């Protein structure tokens, strides 16, 4: 796939190609993972052959210096759901950050639901996430990107240093949507009207069907 080049070499990686077989069942024609990212085998709850795949982090969370890449390609006729079994935790960081790149490509006739759980940045963490989603006309993409205030139950609320997430969606190679989120709690009250309006979770759901974002 012709995704943009990464600025750094990842130390954790997932790569999947979803393909539909002759019986109409979607399977992982390619599956690769490198710890600290790990893939579980596909599950099937629906009679239509939709593959449900979970990614997990054996370390329990994401650390400073982590550079994590997820690449998913959904071929024509394939129908897949990609998610995580729990929140994506970003642990406290002393002198560096974590960077995450998510790359999705949906071919015409493919259906991909990319629905990871919430990102939870712990106190003093710095997170940079870059989402690049490419969809051909006739492909279907549902993608979620959500972040919470932190470990609220432990008394942390917006105690992270910086959370930044950039999302670009391309349809047939043309940029259709650019969404940039940059949250720095120390510089402004994120709960004020016009920002989070009192809510402690911020998220976006991107739906691309028949080239309508």
Question: How would you describe each model-predicted region?
Answer:
Residues 210-213:
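Conserved small/polar residues in nucleotide/adenosyl-binding loops
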Residues 1-118, 123:
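N-terminal, charged/glycine-rich beta-strand/loop interface patches
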Residues 205:
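Glycine-rich, often acidic-flanked micro-motifs
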Residues 67-69, 128, 202:
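Intrinsic-disorder/low-complexity, polar/charged segments enriched in Ser/Thr/Lys/Arg/Asp/Glu/Gln
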Residues 77, 136-138:
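Outer-membrane beta-barrel channels and translocator barrels
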């Amino acid at each position: 796939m012709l995704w943009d080049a990464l600025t750094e070499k990842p130390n954790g990686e997932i790569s999947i190609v979803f393909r539909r077989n002759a019986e109409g069942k979607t399977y992982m024609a390619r599956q690769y993972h490198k710890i600290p990212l790990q893939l579980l085998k596909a599950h099937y709850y629906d009679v239509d052959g939709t593959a449900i795949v979970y990614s997990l982090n054996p370390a329990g969370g994401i650390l400073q210096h982590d550079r994590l890449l997820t690449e998913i390609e959904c071929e024509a006729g394939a129908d897949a759901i990609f998610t995580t079994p729990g929140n994506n935790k970003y642990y406290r960081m002393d002198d560096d950050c974590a960077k995450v790149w998510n790359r999705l490509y949906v071919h015409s006739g493919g259906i991909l639901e990319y629905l990871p759980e919430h990102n939870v940045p712990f106190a003093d963490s710095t997170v940079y996430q870059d989402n690049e989603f490419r969809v051909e006309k006739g492909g279907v993409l549902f993608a979620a990107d959500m972040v919470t205030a932190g470990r609220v139950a432990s008394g942390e609320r917006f105690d992270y240093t910086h959370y930044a997430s950039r999302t670009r969606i391309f349809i047939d190679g043309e940029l259709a949507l650019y969404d940039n989120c940059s949250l720095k709690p120390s510089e402004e009250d994120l709960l004020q009207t016009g920002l989070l309006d009192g809510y402690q979770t911020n998220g976006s759901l991107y739906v691309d069907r028949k080239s309508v974002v």
